[in-house]
């Protein structure tokens, strides 16, 4: 808490300094008021002014505000840029910076000079500029054009009432002179004063048909001379509709997915409106929001790029078609229009078929490969595992071994549900039927009932007990081959006493072997021997 008063005092002390920072614009750097620029070069004038709030700047030349209409002048945040300076650009330039607290002005004096040779010195402030030059001490240089890129366009077409500027910026030593001629005739002083505004540029304004011709600039000094010729064509304005010149647009063929273009060249007294249309094929009218009728046919209006003016007075426009499809094929129209009417010309575009059209198998394969790889691997593996488990279970079921010995009755132990009473003998026929059905006989119950008198009464309880014990497994627990070794005769249950009983149970088997007694049952607690 003891630091709070000190912190408050510190903040209060900073407030006056922060308020003091806000104020009128001030100079951030030194400037050189006198600036010298070479003729035809680019010059930059800085305005290093700062302030809080940031000031707004405005440039003036000889008291006239410089604005966007000055084509060679550009006002930048850091200063003023003048391109291709001319002799008339010399003067006093002022940068005025203003904010809510005041204003500040930065003054420049711009001097434009021709190129001078290295051997010639500019006279100093105290030097003398008079006297004759010593030719022996001078290095002469013949004239040369310093801006050849500005002179590439030698054929110029302009309509009546427009203007044009012809440039021949040159340098040399001694300083060259320039003379303008029209159709090899020197322009008189009166004609030159009407047109020429600047030393190296001939400006022709408010052109008339008689201004058409060849204009030549001749630049010379003691070391030599050079010249350049411009052809000016002044087009007489006529009240007529535009005319499509040349052969374009022409029929075109393009590959599927390729790029092509149509071009349209229109001659008009004034800048025309050039528009591209595409004929709507029959049955596809619903694909387009709006259509227009031209000559009784429906067309859709296509996006159109810039219209370029050509030196011969015509106008050019191109329609670009990229990644061509079958829908792009058809008839296209170039329409040129002005206030007096319109003209149009048509051409056809043919799109070759796709050499590799996509097919349904490719789509299905791509969709299948889009499944996660665990699913692709897991489904077949699971199917194989389930199939193997089922096959293994079937094999184990067919090859299941006989019941273990623990299932046999123990001596002195009577299985539950068994009884020695004759009331239990009533189930014997049904059990015998089950035994004989395993051996293929359906008539065994009748034989058992018929031979019931020969078998002792004590046989049924014991036989019933033994059969009941072993039928729940549906397999034979103790078997003996009735047909001897190597016989294919089915095995016989040991619970029968002799062949008579066997034949009574299963008469259809037919072969029982040479032995008369294949087993016996002793009444010793249910043990089988």
From Swiss-Prot:
SMART domains in UniProt: IG (SM00409), IGc2 (SM00408)
InterPro entries in alphabetical order: FGFRL, Ig-like_dom, Ig-like_dom_sf, Ig-like_fold, Ig_I-set, Ig_sub, Ig_sub2
UniProt membrane topology term: Single-pass membrane protein
One GO cellular component term noted in the UniProt record for this chain: Golgi apparatus
Keywords: Cell membrane, Disulfide bond, Glycoprotein, Immunoglobulin domain, Membrane, Receptor, Repeat, Signal, Transmembrane, Transmembrane helix
Predominant place of localization: membrane
Expression sites (tissue/organ): Highly expressed in the kidney, brain and lung. Weakly expressed in the muscle, thymus, lymph node, stomach, intestine, colon and liver. Expressed in fetal cartilaginous structures like the nasal cartilage, the ribs and the sternum as well as in the cartilaginous rudiments of developing bones such as the vertebrae and the pelvic bone. High expression is found in the muscles of the tongue and the diaphragm.
Sequence ranges on the Extracellular membrane side: 21-374
Cell compartment(s), UniProt: Cell membrane
Membrane-spanning residues: 375-395
Residues with attached carbohydrate: 107, 227, 251, 289
Pfam family membership, one: I-set
Disulphide bridges: 47-95, 168-217, 264-334
Domain of life: Eukaryota
Record region (Disordered): 116-151, 405-427
SUPFAM superfamilies from the UniProt entry: Immunoglobulin
Intervals, Cytoplasmic compartment: 396-529
Domain Ig-like C2-type intervals: 25-111, 143-233, 242-350
GO biological process, one term: cell surface receptor signaling pathway
PROSITE patterns linked: IG_LIKE
Signal peptide: 1-20
Function: Has a negative effect on cell proliferation.
Subunit structure, as described in the record: Interacts with FGF2 with a low affinity.
Protein name: Fibroblast growth factor receptor-like 1
Originating species: Mus musculus (Mouse)
């Amino acid at each position: 808490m003891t630091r709070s008063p000190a912190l408050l005092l510190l903040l209060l002390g900073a407030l006056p300094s922060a308020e003091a920072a806000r104020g009128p614009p001030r100079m951030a750097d030194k400037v050189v008021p006198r600036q010298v620029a070479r003729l035809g070069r680019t010059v930059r004038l800085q305005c290093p002014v700062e302030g809080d709030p940031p000031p707004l700047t405005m440039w003036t030349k000889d008291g006239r505000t410089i604005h966007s209409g000055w084509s060679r002048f550009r006002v930048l945040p850091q200063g003023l840029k003048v391109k291709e300076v001319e002799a008339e650009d010399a003067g006093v330039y002022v940068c005025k910076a203003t904010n809510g607290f005041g204003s500040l002005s930065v003054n420049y004096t711009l001097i434009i000079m021709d190129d001078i040779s290295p051997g010639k010195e500019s006279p100093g402030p105290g030097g003398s500029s008079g006297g004759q030059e010593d030719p022996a001490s001078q290095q002469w240089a013949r004239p040369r054009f310093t801006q050849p890129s500005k002179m590439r366009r030698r054929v110029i077409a302009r309509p009546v009432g427009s203007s044009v500027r012809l440039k021949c910026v040159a340098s040399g030593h001694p300083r060259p002179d320039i003379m303008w001629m029209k159709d090899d005739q020197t322009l008189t002083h009166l004609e030159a004063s009407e047109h020429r505004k600047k030393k190296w540029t001939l400006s022709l304004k408010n052109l008339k048909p008689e201004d058409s011709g060849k204009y030549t600039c001749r630049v010379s000094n003691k070391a030599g001379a050079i010249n350049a010729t411009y052809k000016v064509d002044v087009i007489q304005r006529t009240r007529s509709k535009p005319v499509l010149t040349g052969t374009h647009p022409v029929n075109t063929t393009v590959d599927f997915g390729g790029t092509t273009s149509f071009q349209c060249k229109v001659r008009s007294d004034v800048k025309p409106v050039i528009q591209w249309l595409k004929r709507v094929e029959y049955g596809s009218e619903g694909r387009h929001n709006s259509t227009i009728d031209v000559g009784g046919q429906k067309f859709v209006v296509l996006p159109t790029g810039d219209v370029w003016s050509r030196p011969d007075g015509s106008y050019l426009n191109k329609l670009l078609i990229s990644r061509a499809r079958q829908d792009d094929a058809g008839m296209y129209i170039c329409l040129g229009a002005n206030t007096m009417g319109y003209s149009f010309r048509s051409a056809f575009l043919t799109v070759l078929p796709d050499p590799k059209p996509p097919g349904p198998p490719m789509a299905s394969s791509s969709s299948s490969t889009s499944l996660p790889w665990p699913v692709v691997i897991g489904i077949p593996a699971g199917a194989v595992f389930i199939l193997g488990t089922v096959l293994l279970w079937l094999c184990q079921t067919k090859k299941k071994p006989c019941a273990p010995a623990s299932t046999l009755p123990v001596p002195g132990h009577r299985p539950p549900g068994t009884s020695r009473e004759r009331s239990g003998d009533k189930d014997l026929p049904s059990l015998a039927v089950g035994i004989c059905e395993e051996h293929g006989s359906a008539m065994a119950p009748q034989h058992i009932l018929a031979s019931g008198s020969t078998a002792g009464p004590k046989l049924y309880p014991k036989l019933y007990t033994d059969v009941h014990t072993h039928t729940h497994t549906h397999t034979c627990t103790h078997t003996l081959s009735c047909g001897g070794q190597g016989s294919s005769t089915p095995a016989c249950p040991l619970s029968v006493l002799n062949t008579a009983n066997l034949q009574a149970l299963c008469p259809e088997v037919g072969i029982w072997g040479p032995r008369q007694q294949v087993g016996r049952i002793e009444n010793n607690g249910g043990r089988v021997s």
